[in-house]
Amino acid sequence: MCGPATARRVPASARRGPSAGRGRRDQTGWNGTLFAMEQPSQFHAVRLIQDRCKGCVNCIKHCPTEAIRVRAGKAEILDVRCIDCGECIRVCPNHAKTAVADALDAIGSFRVKVALPAPALYGQFDDSVHPQQVLDGLLDLGFDDVFEVARAADLVTVKIRQEIEKGGIIRPLISSSCPAVVRLIQVRFPNLIDHIVPVSAPVRVAARIARREAAEKYGVRPDEVGVFFLSPCPAKVTAIREPVGYLGPALDGAIPIADIFGPLARAVRARRSQEGGKVKVTASGLGVGWARAGGENQAVALGRQISVDGVHNVIGIFEDIERGRLSGLDYVEALACTGGCVGGVLTVENSFIARRRIRILTEKVHPEEGVPTPEEAVRAMDDALFRHEVPIEPTASFALAGDMREAIRRMERLEAILAGLPGLDCGSCGAPTCQALAEDIVRGEAVETDCVFVLRARVQRLASELGELSAKLPPAMHRSEGEQEKQQVERLLSLPEER
């Protein structure tokens, strides 16, 4: 079970690496390719509470982008590599990693408050609770209206089908719904950027529709409408604040499911005795199914597909795509959290239980009468609603230098350093692998003696040299072996005889 792992505000001791947020354009990628690099995000939801950190190196061993180092006994998060997947939150035994997001009272700054519940929210409740009750419960928490992200997932499904049906496109297409996966591609697999399906994630589509409809319904300006996402993971919190592929945010904040679940559960219980619902259910069961791994593919149901969940499994699939082994596929649903969004670190329910509930809801939930079909709704909408606004670019993360010549020189030095390291990947140096330590040394962020094995070998060599030096005499005092024996005999002969 993934328990609550949130923080409403950033503690003074919550920090990131010393070079946080500093990147440069036109950098050399980790594989030697020169890319036009995007400036790294200035905001990350995942933070370190330094006072709790024991320097145990669990986080550095599990981070999929090697974005964490342990320096002076404390972890540091490197902004340029962090994808906010939350793996460090999941594995830290000291709860030194946390996620920052908005508190529920943040909605009070707006005249009209709209909630965007993630489909994963429905999986947090037991089987007797229908999504209708959850939507109504949100009104009791201070929201004026609700727009289901699952409804937007129904619309996005239609656009994805259209992309798959196109001819002459690069294959396989990779889902853009998981922001941690999109950032993983930016950071670690820049050659796969063109594989990302050019369709917005459901949460952004939902936000744009919800703001427009609320402004019209309540007669207010769009900027007077506060649109808040109920998020299952820190990656989506970051994506809302620092969206990739867009000119700016479409939402006003994100509230962790773990934070809102308690008051929402009480509101749902209080409403059980009431008949009817105030909020119309507009999503289909297939839209709700996007909350679990395989749900997106079930909804799209077109072409040759695979679904992969768990960030380390995703990395394995992406490596195969780079090698050309999966060119026969049409679509890859890739989710960083095991089990899908129901496995996010900002949820409260066991991911396996929640996944089962979502699967049941996929069959049970239907939109109410009068709701247009997704196909009808999409035909009436501007195509720009579903498109990225700017190209997605690689992030300067594994770059060794700013130009190819210097990068090659540093790569040669890196290989020489790596040859002298033990290759044990023990993490005692504060880097996750020997390769990562060699990269840090080349960048001037570490030294070879940070490796305990290199340090021990040098100490042993120094001790041996000191032993040899201690036996040596200055040249003026030096005598050959024959001369030393002759002097010893003469001393013995000069001794007085014993009487």
Regions found by a protein language model. Name each.
Residues M1-N31:
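Compositionally biased, low-complexity flexible segments
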Residues C2, C56, C85-C88, C178, ...:
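Generic recognition of cysteine residues
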Residues G17, S41, D51, R325, ...:
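Generic detector of short alpha-helix boundary/capping microenvironments
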Residues G21, A36-M37:
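Generic detector of N-terminal low-structure segments
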Residues W30-A36, H95-S428, P432-R499:
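Iron-sulfur-associated redox domains of electron-transfer enzymes in respiratory
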Residues E38-Q50, K54-L78, I83, E87-D102, ...:
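Iron-sulfur cluster-binding cysteine motifs and their immediate structural context
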